[in-house]
Amino acid sequence: MHSESPIQRRPSRKIWVGPVAVGGDAPISVQSMTNTDTHDVEATVAQIRRLEAAGADIVRVSVPDMDAAEAFGRIKQQVQLPLVADIHFDYQIALRVAELGVDCLRINPGNIGREDRVRAVVDAARDRGIPIRIGVNAGSLEKDLQKKYGEPTPQALVESALRHVEHLDRLDFQNFKVSVKASDVFMAVAAYRLLAGQIEQPLHLGITEAGGLRSGTVKSAVGLGMLLAEGIGDTIRVSLAADPVEEIKVGFDILKSLHLRSRGINFIACPSCSRQNFDVVKTMNELETRLEDLLVPLDVAVIGCVVNGPGEAKEAHVGLTGGTPNNLVYIDGKPAQKLGNENLVDELERLIRRKAAEKAAADASLIVRS
């Protein structure tokens, strides 16, 4: 039942993506990006709603052409989450989505074109209070930086980012955040570390093109975890070649593991061995599936035997430890109920939901009293 994180976050300027604060003292937000065809309004709206149900704070949508910009406007009218428009090359697309109510523009000033075009986009953003994300990627560095460094390096990523930052500074625009992404964990981490001490704007963290569900989760957890543990990062996106909903789940799991943000159940479970008194793996799989809808922060321990079971169970809001002839459930650190293996998951789910309801009511009462 640990709730406080020892991490001291890097001070940063606060900006607003719609109603979601990013930077400053705001919670670290979790975002994803749609992988539907933006022209398909129905499919894109459906995916955004699934992301919202999974807990996404912000969603990015690719807007490759003017037809997609018009579709973006229709999408924006049908969803509640703040939307970031991902735009490259054509500044007129940025101007159009600004008119249609976009919450944030993801651009690189360097690929928008002439100074007057960049100024037009910045003026549109300034007039409407729209923040900009400068998104630098190792796979699309400027040609002169590729020539200078020979290959993508942390220094090249940061030089590119600072070039864009200076561009916005010249236009007296400070309402922006920055990312310096690479698919290599060490490169991305080094770039963010270099950049963190040179600007005061919020940092959007990500390991780009991290891979599939398993490999991408591991890379993102390692890379983002290193930075977050150092206090670097104000919003995160886990990039996976998978259902975008999985990105949200992994993002929250990373934050939960560092006690930076709590949402839903934090499971503690043993890997199981021959000492287990019930099927730990099956129990865990069923509980994770059944309890996905719970948003109340709750620690749940599922331990198969008495070696570590009582100790772990006592530290959780709800803890199950295997035993003979019966398993023992702890609630808030105290023995509460014995359960046999028959209907074990059903009974455990009932107890967890009851505890979640009690905790939600208690938390609401604290908010009202304060």
From Swiss-Prot:
Enzyme class: oxidoreductase
Catalysis performed (reactions): (2E)-4-hydroxy-3-methylbut-2-enyl diphosphate + oxidized [flavodoxin] + H2O + 2 H(+) = 2-C-methyl-D-erythritol 2,4-cyclic diphosphate + reduced [flavodoxin]
Matches recorded under SUPFAM superfamilies: FMN-linked oxidoreductases, Nitrite and sulphite reductase 4Fe-4S domain-like
Pathway: Isoprenoid biosynthesis; isopentenyl diphosphate biosynthesis via DXP pathway; isopentenyl diphosphate from 1-deoxy-D-xylulose 5-phosphate: step 5/6
Record-listed E.C. numbers: 1.17.7.3
GO biological process: isopentenyl diphosphate biosynthetic process, methylerythritol 4-phosphate pathway; terpenoid biosynthetic process
The keyword Signal belongs to this UniProt entry's keyword annotation: no
Essential cofactor(s): [4Fe-4S] cluster
Gene Ontology molecular function, alphabetical: 4 iron, 4 sulfur cluster binding; 4-hydroxy-3-methylbut-2-en-1-yl diphosphate synthase activity (ferredoxin); 4-hydroxy-3-methylbut-2-enyl-diphosphate synthase activity (flavodoxin); iron ion binding
Cofactor note text: Binds 1 [4Fe-4S] cluster.
Gene3D superfamilies: Dihydropteroate synthase-like, Sulfite Reductase Hemoprotein, domain 1
One matching Pfam family: GcpE
Keywords, ordered alphabetically: 4Fe-4S, Iron, Iron-sulfur, Isoprene biosynthesis, Metal-binding, Oxidoreductase
Binding site for [4Fe-4S] cluster: C270, C273, C305, E312
Protein family: Belongs to the IspG family.
Cited function: Converts 2C-methyl-D-erythritol 2,4-cyclodiphosphate (ME-2,4cPP) into 1-hydroxy-2-methyl-2-(E)-butenyl 4-diphosphate.
The protein's name: 4-hydroxy-3-methylbut-2-en-1-yl diphosphate synthase (flavodoxin)
GN (gene name): ispG
